[in-house]
Amino acid sequence: MLRRDILRLGAALAATPFLHSAHAQSAGPRWSTGAAASVARQELYPEVLDGRIYVAGGLLTPNTGVSAHFESYDPATDRWTRLATLPEARHHIALAAAGGLIYGAGGFSGGFPNWRAQASTYVCDPRADRWRDGVPIPYPAAEGVFAAISQRLYLVGGRTRAVEGARHFNEHVDTARAVSFDPATGHWSAIADAPTARNSAAAAVIGGRLYVVGGRQAARQTDGSLRQVNVADLEVYDPKADRWSVLSPMPQAQGGLAAAAHGGCLYVFGGEQWVPEQKVFDSAWVYDPATDRWRALPSLPTPRHGLGAATVGNRIHVIGGGTRVGGDHASVVHEVLVLSDAMT
């Protein structure tokens, strides 16, 4: 008798919309779908400002094409809006927001293989929908990470020109160099170099510190070609101490991945691998700084690399990226990791 009563109660609870919804919210993270981006592209570094997600530049398909597109996504309406284009088409241009403005730093000009890292920066006031030239980075930089902490901007790692006249992908080298920019003074300053020189990493800010994860290193072979080897390293920069610390590495080395922060944790998505075999990852992970531990998340519905991630509310939006290794399969895919109330 008691068993029948319990079964009836369970059926009644499952049939009650409110209670069912509450149960679904507490069940853990799940994937949903957002409106497709207006342009298929990859090598994206999005930023959030005033509840909107901004995406600029990128590689088109085929990868000889470079985008100057700039658009914003409003999660409240699930709509994309085209905005003023970049002054110059760029891919691997990194975005960060401070003082109500969007800053675009460096990136490559030119399609493959004629990539050329740039030192120029651009600044956009979304209210005016207009770009202007910013203060150049002290050195050409692309494929690094860029983020704002307490109204200062931090640019770390990536690739820079091996020689000033570099006009080819193979004429660039990985760097551990790091700099910060003060919008109030318009000056760039050197900060402590990162422990690891790498490109195609991802980063997010948690508790006023910059977490840099994954990516890859380009090793030159005897024939002059580059061998791209993924790294799993996780490092954190404390701007108050100007010091880096090494943390537990990712369970799996992923390059060309995306990262975002939520609830004091670091979330990472996707990426690709060139050696020992070529593959695109659907893997997603979350790292908790309080325990220095990683755990797996539900896999990306669509494996991608060169994608971007951005957090608004209790949702992480994972946008664009290439669906196959290399640069010829850019997408408009927009998938959303919905996090439970317990994780907000």
PLM regions and their residue ranges:
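C-terminal segment of classical bacterial N-terminal signal peptides
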Residues: P17-S21
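Kelch-like beta-propeller repeat domains
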Residues: L2-L13, A24-T344
